[in-house]
């Protein structure tokens, strides 16, 4: 085998090994992300116990992250502002903010096709409301 073929074979082998490692890291990151999303738990927040104010909450699962600002007045969510939403294809999940305001609860259905982002946004809103609870 001449030197040129040998060099090409070495380069191809090195690229293959690098690709396998990168693929492994990617699959691990996806697995960790899905485990974090599946581990999210939700509590129904009683709005009659949330003090009036503006509260910020966030949820970060590594790949999908959301940060929100919730304004509460007279035991109602007056507004929910999405300050940050890093996602893959989860932009449609942002529609749950309107559902939460309309229904005055965080217990809304996830958006089909954007389930993980829906859960992350929902948890961020729940965390914001929790900050307004006494004690």
State where each predicted segment sits.
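Intrinsically disordered terminal and processing segments
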Residues: 1-67, 71-135
